[in-house]
């Protein structure tokens, strides 16, 4: 779209300064701000808190606690994780694989090396695929059940509501918190040695066609909608997170920890336009292959191959 001249660069609009750093990253391609995200969302784990309490467990806050919770539940005959075939695989694999890129030192440098292909993506993502394999090997999730489960479906919700598993992966929105006969809590993914991380995404974008007849009017509308108080109110009405620097969210006590994580920033974007290859869809496809019996080594090698192929197609040629 950029090369064809369909993208109007919003960088000079005053309202762009109102966006949170993570929302801005998700709206920037090759130095151009191509859209105004009207709201923002995130993916996290939703826990059956009552079930954990039955076994004297608390909602985990780091990797060690997470593995202990999973092992204790499994020993008591409970399937810990009710994964689905889509983001229920993608989100934990991305969190376990890419946290180093976004939360370590030198994020921009790492992204550039990945984007140029000087660093193979498997250098990070192998850890993510190994994590998924570990979950399968230890019986913390059922790969066949996962491949049969559609995300955000009634079937997935019923499976969790009937206490067939202890936690699922969900997208943050008002509906996520409704309809359970037990206490729930939505948290970031406690997969790091020293804490948690989540995947975030800009939602409902506004963009401007530079060839529009009424360009000035379109710019005026975007400026008006991009005011902090408008973004905050819009997100509140939708039951989502504001894309403003405030990152306000509806007052849902069960989501305090995941909102705090989003506000902190440096989370993993579901789409990072600084990378000249796909992450979200590819990680989903390769995670499904892993659930079908392919090894972490095989899917990592396949990802490296796709990375190089896509860079040669979409990367910048100097």
For each predicted feature, which ranges?
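A ligand-binding cleft/hinge motif common to bilobed small-molecule-binding domains
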Residues: 1-2, 170-183
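Long, aromatic- and glycine/proline-rich binding clefts that accommodate carbohydrate-like moieties
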Residues: 184-187, 235-289, 312-318
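Glycine-centered hinge/linker elements that transmit conformational signals in sensory
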Residues: 72, 114-146
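Extracytoplasmic/periplasmic solute-binding protein
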Residues: 34-36, 43, 67-117
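Short, solvent-exposed loop/beta-turn-alpha elements that line the ligand-binding surface or hinge
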Residues: 9-19, 101-127, 191-199
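Short helices/loops that flank or line small-molecule/ion binding pockets
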Residues: 52, 68-76, 151-168, 292
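Hinge/lid segment of periplasmic solute-binding proteins
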Residues: 1-43, 58, 67, 187
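Extracytoplasmic/periplasmic substrate-recognition and gating elements
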Residues: 32-33, 55, 178-240
């Amino acid at each position: 779209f950029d090369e064809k001249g369909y993208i109007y660069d919003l960088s000079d609009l005053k309202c762009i300064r109102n966006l949170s750093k993570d929302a801005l990253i998700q709206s920037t391609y090759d130095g151009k701000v191509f859209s105004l995200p009207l709201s923002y969302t995130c993916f996290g784990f939703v826990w059956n808190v009552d079930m954990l309490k039955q076994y004297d467990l608390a909602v985990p806050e780091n990797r060690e606690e997470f593995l202990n919770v999973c092992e204790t539940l499994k020993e008591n005959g409970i399937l810990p994780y009710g994964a689905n075939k889509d983001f229920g695989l993608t989100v934990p694999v991305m969190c376990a694989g890419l946290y180093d890129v976004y939360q370590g030192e030198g994020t921009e440098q790492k992204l550039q090396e990945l984007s140029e292909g000087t660093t193979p993506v498997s250098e990070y993502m192998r850890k993510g695929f190994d994590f998924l394999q570990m979950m399968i090997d230890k019986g913390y999730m059922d790969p066949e059940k996962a491949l049969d489960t559609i995300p955000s479906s009634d079937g997935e919700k019923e499976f969790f509501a009937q206490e067939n598993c202890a936690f699922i992966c969900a997208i943050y929105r008002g509906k996520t918190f409704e309809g359970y006969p037990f206490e729930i809590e939505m948290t970031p993914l406690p997969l790091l040695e020293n804490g948690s991380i989540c995947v975030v995404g800009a939602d409902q974008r506004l963009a401007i066609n530079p060839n529009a007849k009424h360009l000035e009017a379109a710019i005026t509308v975007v400026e008006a909608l991009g005011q902090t108080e408008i973004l905050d109110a819009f997100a509140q009405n939708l039951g989502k997170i504001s894309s403003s620097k405030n990152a306000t969210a509806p007052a849902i006590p069960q989501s305090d920890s995941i909102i705090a994580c989003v506000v902190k920033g440096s989370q993993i974007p579901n789409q990072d336009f600084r990378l000249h290859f796909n992450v979200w869809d590819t990680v989903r496809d390769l995670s499904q292959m892993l659930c079908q019996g392919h090894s972490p080594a095989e899917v990592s090698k396949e990802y490296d191959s796709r990375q190089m192929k896509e860079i040669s197609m979409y990367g910048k040629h100097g």
